[in-house]
Amino acid sequence: MWLDHIKYHGPMRTHQLVLSWIEAELSEGRLTVGGRLPAERTLAEQLKVSRTSVREAIRILEAMGVVRAGVGSGPEAGTVVISDPTAALGSALRLHVATQHLPVADIVETRVLLESWAASKASPQAPELEAAGRLLEEMAAGGLDVDEFLALDVRFHLALADAAGNAVVSAMMGSLRESIQRYAAQLTSNLPDW
């Protein structure tokens, strides 16, 4: 039984049982990206938990960027497994930056470290480097408002991270950029050139 594979760390809330089941199904390959979770009622009956616990687990997984839940009927209905680690990491970092537990300067320093590593690991022929070069040219051309410039800047830095071919570094870079995007926009809008 799937429950036999869960390490016991004390009492578990019922939504955590649902999360553990979904993790086990993903790990074993029975659920994959693009696949659908069983219907809420079916899952609740199968795991012997309330539908409220299933809904809570699904909301948590949505926030983590693991599933997308659609209501109603048709092709968009149901809960589909997705993979968007940047969303969850970015949200968590942004909240911790807002609490001032994670200083913006530390986020920027981490971003620079990861980006430097990614640039050093990238193949000179990586198409992402060519894309980054085009983005730099667009930024240097001028005539951009703050929002346009920042959008190009984000794409430039993400292209550098992607050039290394490391999915974790790419996700981390996206999350780090997202976590300080509001602060960057505030700082940039105060520059005399804009």
PLM features per residue range, with description:
Residues 188-194:
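Short, intrinsically disordered, charge-balanced linker/junction segments flanking boundaries
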Residues 43, 82, 96, 129, ...:
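Hydrophobic alpha-helical segments
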Residues 11, 15, 146, 194:
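Flexible, glycine- and charge-enriched loops at secondary-structure boundaries
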Residues 107-186:
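Conserved amphipathic alpha-helical segments that form helical-bundle/coiled-coil interaction surfaces
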Residues 1-113:
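Short linear motifs at protein or domain termini
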